[in-house]
Amino acid sequence: MRLLQRSLAILLFFTTAAGAQDVIRARSTLVLVPTLVETKKGEPVFALKPEDFVITDNGVIQPARLEEDTDLEPLALAVVIQTGREAFAQTNNLRGLNTMIDSLIGDVDRSVAVVAFDSQPQLIQDFTGKALDVSDALKSLQAGDGGAAILDAVKYATHLLSQQPKEYRRAVLLISETRDHGSHAAIQEVVQQVGETNTVVYSVAFSPSKTELKDSFRGNNATGPSANLLSPILMTIQAFRRNTSAAIAHLTGGEYVRFDSQFGFDQQIGNLTNHVHNRYILSFQPPSPAPGLHGIRVQLPAHSNLRVIARQSYWASAPPD
């Protein structure tokens, strides 16, 4: 599929080549859908063809295409790290973070920023192409207060990314706990901003406490007519409340993993990197999509025994006047 150095390039799929157009703002919307297909044992599946996939946009079937080549375009990455609440105790587990960042980005032009957050986000290192500056910023992190304003931090990072050159693709590497504590930004506001700026969020979360883990599964098995009739935005809000870091990753086509030790961190990053460069990049072009959040579903009707992990939604903005 792709070499390791192309891993993050595949994740950062939302902008068009060389920034030629804003794919979500344009009337002719190109939606790219990174898709991982696995067996029940977790082994990646290759050799599928476009006709094997069925993509729906708000329930309407769309013609699917398979993007064979992904150019190595420049990457803008915001590394967003929680330092509030109990997060700073996880610092020793993140010793391999700088190496992981370099491995994911690979041999392409890059611009990396470091943002720390507790009850509010703080820019530790502005966008730079120097790996040493990023390393020094990561080493300088200090324990924060009792907040964990994940939504505020993602909104802040997305704003910073929106100011980068248009030819740069955009991504957030979010390292945090699973639940938001203390954000002022509304979920809908963050969802719209992430969608409109074509930013993919890649979440690596501390394992939650037993109480949080129990709470996070409440409501997941809802039955009855209301379970499948909720609008995409209402379903998204519910997901964000259960597990903020997972919801925002799934929303944007990124991936969510959890860890509770340095070994777990290294192992999960290795698994995630393997997933990234083994993904299919599907695309479809809906005619004149209605403004707002659209739900995406990817299926393999002839291969019901396979597991499909794909982007779940995109945001279509109103056309300019």
Per-segment meaning from a language model:
Residues 12-13, 52:
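Exposed boundary/loop context
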